[in-house]
Amino acid sequence: MQLSDFSFDLPKSLISFHPYFIRSTCRLMVMYGHTGMIFHKRFFNIIDEINSGDLIILNNTQVIPARFFGKKESGGKVEVLVEKILGINNILASIKNSKNINIGSKIFFGYKDKIKGSVVDCKNSFFEIFFHDNIDSAIDIINNIGEIPLPPYIKRFRNKLDVDLYQTVYKKKTGSIAAPTAGLHFDLPLLEALHNKGVDIDYITLHIGSGTFQPIRRVQIEEHIMHSESVEVSSSVIQKIKSCKKKGGRIIAVGTSTLRALESAYHSSEWSDSKDFISDTNIFIYPGYKHNIVDALITNFHFPESTLIMLVCSFLGYKNTMNAYNTAIVNKYSFFSYGDAMYITHNKLAPYENFII
């Protein structure tokens, strides 16, 4: 399959640069995978699509204030974007204006440049930085000097709404540099209404890295190598999934990150033994992949030629997905992180679809 197969023309006017003030009032497209039928609703109507006995699984990662600035020993300014917290005092990060930064280089951060960091390793395009601080940990330092990084296509200044609305209401475990955006549409009243309906709700953790915004640079998508991200799926979640399916309930994943975490766990030895799955994953899901767990997926409208739209195609079917996206454009849905949402059910025939463009 070629990268261009997943291209489409998106008017810039449909890119959302600001969040919905009331989370659950965004628009919702519903598409049933087995029929391709489409319905237009609001996100709070999603309660009508989910049944008592179903299990919703959300990604409880929390976005860290991963973007901050520092000075090189020469006085030159650098911008740091944390990719991963490696330990108590160590981070993995990309550095803008990284010319002449090598192993052993010193970078100074914070008020009056009192926080010193040393580059102790270089890994591909990332640098490992060690903070020389006997009091604060790396996460404490980041919380003190950093700011929440909005997606790179949003060029405006951040505001107080972003601090709140670019996090989910159920955030718990710090580590992402980008929000699990499908979850942004849930507010506490909606979660309570789902619970009162008899819907079970549980959580996994996948810390989203900068690779989620990186373009595919291969003509043939099968040659693409995914970035690696940290994932945790607890033994209790695995047991709940097995029990739910045994009773005839459905598994509903909120976000592509949740689906990828579950599929990664499924292919591990921990799944059959119902043990905690804690690992890194670089699973790449594209058309032809056979899904094993999720019956319905809640997701946003994604970038052309992205790994995310490829995952949606694998779940919903290529023709269904392209029809849904064309319908979204005609009906002026909002796209990307702050945009509108889809609720899609699994098309079991998708892996066998005749992929002819």
From Swiss-Prot:
It is an enzyme of class 2 (transferase). It comes from the Bacteria. GO terms for biological process: queuosine biosynthetic process; tRNA wobble guanine modification. It is found in: Cytoplasm. It holds the Pfam family Queuosine_synth. Its EC number is 2.4.99.17. One of its GO terms (cellular component) is cytoplasm. Its main location: cytoplasm. Pathway: tRNA modification; tRNA-queuosine biosynthesis. Gene3D superfamilies: QueA-like. One of its GO terms (molecular function) is S-adenosylmethionine:tRNA ribosyltransferase-isomerase activity. Keywords: Cytoplasm, Queuosine biosynthesis, S-adenosyl-L-methionine, Transferase. It catalyses: 7-aminomethyl-7-carbaguanosine(34) in tRNA + S-adenosyl-L-methionine = epoxyqueuosine(34) in tRNA + adenine + L-methionine + 2 H(+). Monomer. Belongs to the QueA family. Transfers and isomerizes the ribose moiety from AdoMet to the 7-aminomethyl group of 7-deazaguanine (preQ1-tRNA) to give epoxyqueuosine (oQ-tRNA). This is S-adenosylmethionine:tRNA ribosyltransferase-isomerase. The gene is queA.
